UniProtKB/Swiss-Prot annotation:
Intervals of motif 'HIGH' region: 58-68
One GO biological process term: isoleucyl-tRNA aminoacylation
Residues reported to bind ATP: K610
Protein name: Isoleucine--tRNA ligase
Compartment(s): Cytoplasm
UniProt keyword terms in alphabetical order: Aminoacyl-tRNA synthetase, ATP-binding, Cytoplasm, Ligase, Metal-binding, Nucleotide-binding, Protein biosynthesis, Zinc
């Protein structure tokens, strides 16, 4: 063998079998940035049709987690695939930099503003802290192979962006959507600030559930509403009963609310302490059961509408409250009578406005009753629940009390229960200028993926309250408005003033607002106007980036955002704040497509939790397995639902990666010595199987590009794996090894094969590039340096487009796709019999076998098209076809109807060079150890191959 070894075309490549990604990827990253890969992409795509994926900014606090990695990798895959599809797809990453979490971190270091440091110093410390957090997260994202404007990201705290956020506020005010109101808002007593809807999360909480009596102020007038018969009016005090789980709100009660069409019943409670109570008829039995009242009877009925404006005594204060009517009253639970405190609930506030009720708010920003609150001054509201219950008992107003577990709003940061609290706030009004209706209409023009996203955001927009955009914080973009000290009206020149402020902020940052002397801007008006000192909700900051970033950054060339891509929780967050602000400013949605992904869970479907110990950190994965494994995991998941990750799941991704890598390595190793400029075989002269393989690559490419276009990365990876493992690995690459290794070096048989391998790897490397970016770059650098045209290969795979050199077989060809599909089935059936023969020691390897295939006429005609090259497809030393009628006794049935196969151990000698057993081994003078085919390949013109 040694004398012929040098005549074999053995594979050779500098592309290693082991990826060793954790070590190699940082070296590749270094080269990407040294050679300005992102800049090269931008240059290559300049002037192409644009595709803008606008980055939802992560919060600049803490290390990135696996959810961040999922999100950013998905964005990167989509942008790279769009680039390969010929789009100019810039990516400007962003960060959300203002807000409470950063304030809290800075407070730990320097204390609260106004104590050890001034507010100005505090803001500067916040800016420094956020900048450091951005840098840390930036490096983590870059390590994942994500390409973008990392040197010029957008940060909501950049002076220019802060100025544009202020301008956005001005436009919303100009368009009539800004509202100043004294309204109940979600209030976190730990934050000391209002919260947006998106900052509220619901968790179970145990609260006191109480049924409370409100005595009738005028019994006779009330009883007259029930049309009772003379002498059947009952006995004892008359009360209407409310149910609540927030006893602490009772000091602010200003009404009891009924529904106009509900029937209410006057019940006589019997026994030693008779009384008469009023509840909704539907709920009467529930109320009686709950209160443990067994003996009672009904005295009469009245509609809610009949009881409107009847007066009742407050249970512990010396004033009366009216019965009012509201549509929000239901019979799902409670008594059908709703305790109404306009200062502590949005529905209460809304119905209170109709009846001109006082909006009482006896609670301070820290959750403590104000000093003038009768009975409860100085107590924290949640601790005061017990005191309120005791007071109700003392006053004889408590009908029933028990502990009740229910879903309750909590602060997303502190994880503590929040309250509704009426305060003066700034709102983006949903209805005063038709914003809600316009938003709902615009939603229909957006493509929501998955489709359920549309109904989800529609429901949220339909039901949402006014957007409270003001915060009582230090580190945030100011609500840069001047209001009249007496009327609270905006200054008549607000538009011009906002632009002047924005110009100063553009130069000096938000601190400029607090530094500006009102007289500088207002002149003589300064005496009548005061600055608003509230800051903007951070959801406003990020929500207006469609204007502050997309409209303003030169990278986007004035194009609108095509896509927003975030987690499904952003229907109530960024998707919604962006939509509302864009409609308020421009009258249209800020995006054309909205794509959402689910949350990351562990292999058992549980949320990531340090206490459970199931947290998978991106850094740990890249340090151990490499970023390409993490990227392949992201691409392989159906990300529209929950996305599972665990060591076992990542191991499966690593296994899949190895199969793809090994396929690519086979291609590269067998292109050794191939020069596309001089060695390409014309299509019409290629061996039939080689043309089929290129056709399979074309079919795969069509499906893969379609899947990329539909953002279906899961389908991309499935098709890629099928192509590498099944179409190539299990069939084509297996069949061509003999020809590639043993054919005449540089002869037609070998060059045809290499031509196919070259075309396929040109396509394969591009399919991989959006997902396995590092490995694709590594492959690219091992591919032939020159192209068929003689031009040099581009420096990077990412600057090009999908390979356009593939071609398919015509269906009219004799050896078309259907033919090769049938041959794969025949080969599969034969392989089962060869495996059995190996198991029973009839043969060693398949090249020790000779086959006779007994086939029916139709199948035999197809198989015979391969002529004497059938044995190469079946990987045996000999294979002949005979009619089924001549079937031998030794022939075995296969799982193909009309096909029997006889497997025999060959008696021919083994060729030292190709290992085939053929009768001519030892018959050729001077080459006694090799077969005639090998002699031709070593000393002659080389074997001719037409089919395989």
């Amino acid at each position: 063998m040694s004398e012929y070894k040098d005549t074999l075309n053995l594979p050779e490549t500098g592309f290693p079998m082991r990826g060793d990604l954790a070590k190699r990827e940082p070296e590749m990253l270094k080269r990407w940035y040294q050679e300005d890969l992102y800049g090269e992409i931008r240059k290559a795509k300049k002037g192409k049709k644009s595709f803008v994926l606008h980055d939802g900014p992560p919060y600049a606090n803490g290390d990135i987690h696996i959810g961040h990695a999922l999100n950013k990798i998905l964005k990167d895959i989509i942008i790279k695939s769009k680039t390969l599809s010929g789009f100019d797809a810039p990516y400007v990453p962003g960060w959300d930099c203002h807000g409470l979490p950063i304030e809290l971190m800075v407070e730990k270091k320097v204390g609260k503003p106004g104590q050890k440091v001034t507010a100005a110093e505090f803001r500067e410390k916040c800016r420094e802290y956020a900048a450091g957090q951005v840098e840390g997260q930036k490096e983590s994202f870059k390590r994942l192979g994500i390409m973008g404007e990392w040197d010029k990201p957008y940060r909501t705290m950049d002076f220019t962006t802060e100025a544009n956020i202020i301008r956005a506020l001005g436009q919303i005010a100009d368009n009539g959507h800004l509202l100043k109101g004294f309204k109940p808002v979600h209030w976190c007593t730990d934050c000391g600030s209002a919260l947006a809807e998106a900052e509220v999360e619901y968790k179970n909480k145990v609260s006191p559930s109480i049924d409370v009596r409100f005595k009738a102020a005028d019994e006779a007038a009330l009883l007259a509403k029930f049309s009772l018969n003379e002498g059947h009016q009952g006995q004892g005090d008359v009360s209407i009963v409310i149910w609540t789980t927030t006893p602490w709100t009772l000091p602010a009660n200003r009404a009891v609310c009924l529904r106009d069409d509900l029937e209410y019943v006057l019940i006589q409670v019997e026994g030693d302490n008779p009384e008469r109570i009023i509840v909704a008829a539907e709920l009467a039995k529930d109320v009686m059961d709950r209160a443990g009242i067994e003996h009672f009877h009904n005295l009469g009925f009245a509609k809610g509408a009949d009881l409107e404006l009847t007066q009742f005594q407050h249970p512990f204060y010396d004033f009366t409250v009216p019965a009012i009517l509201g549509d929000h009253v239901t019979t799902d639970s409670g008594t059908g009578v709703v305790h109404t405190a306009p200062g502590h609930g949005q529905e209460d506030f809304a119905v209170g406005q109709k009846y001109n009720l006082e909006v009482a708010n006896p609670v301070g920003s820290n959750g403590v009753y104000l000093p003038d609150t009768e009975l409860f001054a100085g107590q924290h509201v949640f601790k005061a629940n017990d005191a309120v219950v005791e007071t109700l008992k003392e006053k004889g107003a408590l009908l029933h009390h028990h502990a009740y577990e229910h879903s309750y709003p909590h602060c997303w940061r502190h994880k503590t229960p929040i309250i509704f609290r009426a305060t003066p706030q700034w709102f983006v009004s949903m209805d005063q200028a038709g914003l809600r209706a316009k938003a709902l209409e615009s939603i229909k023009g957006v493509q929501w993926m998955p489709e359920w996203g549309q109904s989800r955001i529609e429901g949220m927009i339909e039901g949402r309250p006014e957007w409270c955009i003001s915060r009582q914080r230090t580190w945030g973009v100011p609500i840069a408005l001047f209001v009249h000290k007496e009327t609270a009206e905006l200054h008549p020149n607000t538009s011009e003033l906002i632009e002047k402020v924005a110009q100063v902020v553009e130069q000096k940052g938000i601190q400029a607002w607090w530094d500006i002397d009102a007289a500088e801007l207002l002149g003589d008006d300064a005496a009548q106007y005061e600055k608003v000192l509230d800051t903007l909700d951070v959801w406003f900051d990020s929500g207006v980036t469609h204007y502050a970033v997309v409209d303003k950054r030169e990278e986007f060339n004035g194009a609108e955002a095509d896509m927003y891509l975030e987690g499904s929780d952003q229907h109530r967050g960024w998707f919604q704040s962006s939509l509302i602000s864009s409609i308020a400013m421009k009258g249209k949605a800020p995006y054309k497509q909205v794509l959402t992904h689910g949350f990351v869970v562990d292999g058992h479907g549980r949320k990531m939790s340090k206490s459970i110990g199931n947290v998978v950190a991106p850094k740990d994965v890249t340090n151990k397995l490499g970023a390409d494994i993490l990227r392949l995991w992201v691409a392989s998941t159906d990300y529209t639902g929950e996305v599972a990750v665990s060591d076992e799941i990542l191991k499966r991704s690593a296994d899949a990666y190895r199969r793809i890598r090994n396929t690519a390595r086979f291609f590269l190793a067998n292109l050794n010595g191939f020069n596309p400029e001089t060695d390409i075989v014309p299509v019409e002269e290629m061996v039939a199987l080689d043309r089929w393989a290129v056709g399979r690559a074309l079919a795969a490419q069509n499906e893969i590009v379609k899947a990329y276009d539909e953002y279906n990365t899961h389908a991309v990876t499935q098709r890629l794996m099928h192509f590498c493992s099944i179409e190539m690995g299990s069939f084509y690459l297996d069949v061509i090894k003999d020809r590639q290794y043993t054919a005449k070096l540089g002869g037609h048989a070998q060059r045809s094969c290499q031509t196919a391998l070259y075309y396929i790897v040109e396509a394969l490397v591009r399919w991989m590039a959006p997902i396995m970016s590092f490995t694709a770059d590594e492959i690219w650098n091992q591919m032939p340096a020159s192209l068929p045209s003689g031009e040099s290969r581009d420096k990077f795979v990412f600057t090009g487009e999908w390979f356009d050199g593939l071609f398919g077989l015509a269906e009219g060809e004799e050896l078309n796709n259907a033919f090769w599909s049938e041959m794969q089935k025949v080969r599969g059936a034969v392989n089962k019999l060869l495996e059995a023969a190996r198991s029973d020691k009839t043969i060693g390897g398949s090249l020790q076998a000779e086959l006779t295939l007994f086939a029916d006429d139709a199948l035999a005609a197809k198989i015979n098209k391969l002529e004497d090259e059938l044995r190469f497809v079946l990987l045996t030393s000999a294979a002949t076809v005979k009619p089924l009628s001549e079937k031998s006794d030794a022939a075995q049935a296969t799982d193909i109807e009309g096909l029997f196969v006889e497997v025999r151990a060959t008696e021919a000698e083994k060729c030292d060079r190709c290992w085939h057993h053929t009768p001519d081994v030892g018959t050729i003078e001077g080459h006694e150890k090799i077969c005639g085919r090998c002699v031709s390949n070593v000393d002659g013109e080389g074997e001719a191959r037409k089919f395989a």
